[in-house]
Design a protein with these regions (language model features):
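Short N-terminal helix-loop-first-beta-strand/juxtamembrane motif that initiates sensory/input modules
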Residues: 1-13
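Acidic, low-complexity cytosolic segments
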Residues: 11, 16-164
């Protein structure tokens, strides 16, 4: 499982702002960015990548920004996981962390690192660290949920073997 935070840069278009653990395969990156670039009405959606045997579970949301055109930053949390996992097990955690990101004061500054007139703002580095911490916490919670779900599935399979 991997977790990515996507950001819509109004100058260059969609980009993967942060992923954990490590980077995401180039072919998968292109697909995720393509889905983020679509005009979606649903905030929560999944995409099956049949050839890759993966599933992308996505939650789109926006945060208020004093610096962005239209006063909002467009973001998406994406879980890249095995095709067999149900997207529903991830929803409440993705929602919880989208709310935490939306609620964090001035967190939009984390997206203005290079090439912006505001890059000298002393709060930028603090906000980058705060955002990374939130994403890592989200990843840990998703991992815990996945492990619990896998254990539950093992127990269910054992009980199904019994004849009642």
């Amino acid at each position: 499982m991997k977790l990515a935070l996507l950001y819509f840069n109004t100058i260059t278009g969609p980009e993967i702002y942060f992923s954990h653990p490590g980077s995401i395969k180039e072919s998968i990156c292109k697909k995720i960015l393509g889905f983020f670039d679509l005009d979606m009405s649903d905030q929560f959606f999944e995409v099956s990548l049949i050839e890759d045997e993966l599933k992308l579970i996505n939650l789109y949301f926006e945060i208020t920004s004093c610096w962005a055109r239209g006063n909002k930053e467009m973001l998406m949390l994406s879980v890249i996981t095995d095709k067999n996992h149900k997207s529903e097990i991830f929803y409440d955690i993705l929602k919880e962390y989208s709310i935490k990101i939306m609620s964090a004061v001035n967190l939009y500054k984390a997206f203005y690192v290079k090439g912006y007139l505001k890059e000298n703002d002393p709060e930028i580095e603090l906000k980058i660290n705060e955002l990374h911490t939130l994403i890592l916490e989200c990843y840990d919670k998703l991992g815990e949920r996945l492990n619990i779900n896998l254990e539950d599935e093992k127990i269910i399979k054992k009980f199904k073997k019994f004849e009642w």
